[in-house]
């Protein structure tokens, strides 16, 4: 039922009543204000003072007390001796001054696990525009108005086959459907789909990767064309991954075009081929955030290759590693002892020192490398987001550093790492890097206890 309509006469009556009421109010006001105050009528009370608003975000003070090296060493002595930490390497630094406050085996290369992604993110921030996007194209496979079309991948693993309006794992992902619409407007009638994944070179699996991790949802073969980073179930974080991601991307395009997906092949696009369609990934800064918060291995490998191509290195595992370490060295971040085989940290063959990891964080938090400052915002928040969302929430410690600590986590079998920045209870900003190899069954909890103790420390003596 629609709203009741008022008749014209109703409007007239109501309008007259309103005018009469206004006239009475005006007359009453005149009696009070023009003829002096009537007996028994009080003057209006003064308006209340505006409330004082406290800032929601307050910058840390440069004058906050710096912990002493002796105080930090004494405070961490017991927790750092926990046998569940196994072989522990670590370093703690004052963010503002760069002063080293604590170290243990900080120059000994150990398996860093996913904290390796800190180096990948740092190199990307130093090399690429934060708004950089990756283009996935479709070109004509020949000169005829009917014929094959070629899906040309450039390293965007987030391309999705989901229809418009349907969620995908990656926010802002490009869609196969948009490619199809453009192809249909191009005047070309596709008869087959081919996939050009030649932008990437070398092996698709890094040394030290376990093929079982494909089924476990940790990784997929790294190819220049992919759908949902190879996920079989696009919106499930630990979905089993495809072993043929480039072919799968072509098959999804073929299905959307009404062609036989089984007929999709791998082929190089003809030189100078006519572009029929193009879509773009989300901006780099958004993809970095997804990589760091979800510890996304496929994303890390593809971003490593973005750094590689930007400084004329091959888009391969070795090319990306060389590009990342070279870029950090150019920024005066010491990578001595680094021996890496991937950009994600998934391989057990990777080696990094706590010194390199902490130096990267100190560069981001300190005053000398403003291009790295966004790295701090990319880190998960203790008790709040990403891989730290469920950590540091122990009620017995009043939640400790929850909200005060941001860090990248790392976890492999018997390996734990935690690298980041915190504001201690004295208001001082500290950077830290902890790597634990040969860890015991409670190794992760022991590492959290180490970081919590540092936050509580305030060790000025």
Swiss-Prot record:
<dbReference type="InterPro" id="IPR012338">
    <property type="entry name" value="Beta-lactam/transpept-like"/>
</dbReference>
<comment type="similarity">
    <text>Belongs to the peptidase S13 family.</text>
</comment>
<feature type="active site">
    <location>
        <position position="295"/>
    </location>
</feature>
<keyword id="KW-0645">Protease</keyword>
<keyword id="KW-0961">Cell wall biogenesis/degradation</keyword>
<dbReference type="InterPro" id="IPR000667">
    <property type="entry name" value="Peptidase_S13"/>
</dbReference>
<feature type="active site" description="Acyl-ester intermediate">
    <location>
        <position position="114"/>
    </location>
</feature>
<feature type="active site" description="Proton acceptor">
    <location>
        <position position="117"/>
    </location>
</feature>
<dbReference type="InterPro" id="IPR056340">
    <property type="entry name" value="Rv3627c-like_N"/>
</dbReference>
<dbReference type="GO" id="GO:0006508">
    <property type="term" value="P:proteolysis"/>
</dbReference>
<comment type="function">
    <text>Carboxypeptidase that cleaves terminal D-alanine from peptidoglycan in the mycobacterial cell wall. May cleave L-Lys-D-Ala and/or D-Ala-D-Ala peptide bonds. Exerts important effects on mycobacterial cell morphology and cell division.</text>
</comment>
<keyword id="KW-0732">Signal</keyword>
<keyword id="KW-0378">Hydrolase</keyword>
<dbReference type="GO" id="GO:0004185">
    <property type="term" value="F:serine-type carboxypeptidase activity"/>
</dbReference>
<dbReference type="GO" id="GO:0005576">
    <property type="term" value="C:extracellular region"/>
</dbReference>
<dbReference type="Pfam" id="PF02113">
    <property type="entry name" value="Peptidase_S13"/>
</dbReference>
<feature type="signal peptide">
    <location>
        <begin position="1"/>
        <end position="28"/>
    </location>
</feature>
<keyword id="KW-0121">Carboxypeptidase</keyword>
<dbReference type="GO" id="GO:0071555">
    <property type="term" value="P:cell wall organization"/>
</dbReference>
<dbReference type="GO" id="GO:0000270">
    <property type="term" value="P:peptidoglycan metabolic process"/>
</dbReference>
<dbReference type="Pfam" id="PF23714">
    <property type="entry name" value="Rv3627c_N"/>
</dbReference>
<protein>
    <recommendedName>
        <fullName>Carboxypeptidase Rv3627c</fullName>
        <ecNumber>3.4.16.-</ecNumber>
    </recommendedName>
</protein>
């Amino acid at each position: 039922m629609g709203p009741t309509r008022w008749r014209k006469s109703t409007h007239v009556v109501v309008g007259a009543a309103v005018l009469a009421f206004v006239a009475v109010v005006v007359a009453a006001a005149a009696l009070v204000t023009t003829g002096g105050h009537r007996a028994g009528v009080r003057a209006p009370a003064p308006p209340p003072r505006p409330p004082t608003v406290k800032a929601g975000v307050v910058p840390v003070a440069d004058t906050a007390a710096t912990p002493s090296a002796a105080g930090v060493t004494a405070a961490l002595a017991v927790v750092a001796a926990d046998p569940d930490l196994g072989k522990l390497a670590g370093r703690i630094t004052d963010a503002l001054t760069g002063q080293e406050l604590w170290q243990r085996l900080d120059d000994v290369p150990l398996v860093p696990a996913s904290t390796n992604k800190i180096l990948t993110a740092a190199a990307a921030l130093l090399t690429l525009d934060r708004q950089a996007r990756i283009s996935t194209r479709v070109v004509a496979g020949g000169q005829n108005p009917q014929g094959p079309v070629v899906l040309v991948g450039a390293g965007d693993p987030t391309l999705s086959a989901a229809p418009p309006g349907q969620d995908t794992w990656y926010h802002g992902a490009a869609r196969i459907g948009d490619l199809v619409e453009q192809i249909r407007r191009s005047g070309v009638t596709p008869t087959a789909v081919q996939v050009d994944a030649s932008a990437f070179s070398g092996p698709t699996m890094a040394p030290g990767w376990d093929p079982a991790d494909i089924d476990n949802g940790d990784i997929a073969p790294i190819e220049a064309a992919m759908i949902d980073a190879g996920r079989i179930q696009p919106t499930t974080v630990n979905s089993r991954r495809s072993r043929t991601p480039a072919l799968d991307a072509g098959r999804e395009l073929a299905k959307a075009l009404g062609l036989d997906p089984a007929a999709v092949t791998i082929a190089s696009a003809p030189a100078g081929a006519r572009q029929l369609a193009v879509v773009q990934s989300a901006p780099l800064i958004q993809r970095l955030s997804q990589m760091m918060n979800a510890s996304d291995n496929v994303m890390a490998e593809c971003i490593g290759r973005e750094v590689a191509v930007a400084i004329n290195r091959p888009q391969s595992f070795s090319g990306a590693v060389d590009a990342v370490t070279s870029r950090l060295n150019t920024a005066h971040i010491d990578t001595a002892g680094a021996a890496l085989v991937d950009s994600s940290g998934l391989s057990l063959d990777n080696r990094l020192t706590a010194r390199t990891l902490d130096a990267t964080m100190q560069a981001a938090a300190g005053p000398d490398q403003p291009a790295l400052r966004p790295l701090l915002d990319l880190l998960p928040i203790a008790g709040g987001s990403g891989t730290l969302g469920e950590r540091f929430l122990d009620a017995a410690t009043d939640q400790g550093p929850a909200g005060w600590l941001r860090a990248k986590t790392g976890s492999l079998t018997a390996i734990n790492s935690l690298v980041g920045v915190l504001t201690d209870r004295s208001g001082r900003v500290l950077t830290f890097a902890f790597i634990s190899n040969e860890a015991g069954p409670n190794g992760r909890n022991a590492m959290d206890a180490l970081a919590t103790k540092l936050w509580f420390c305030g060790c000025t003596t």
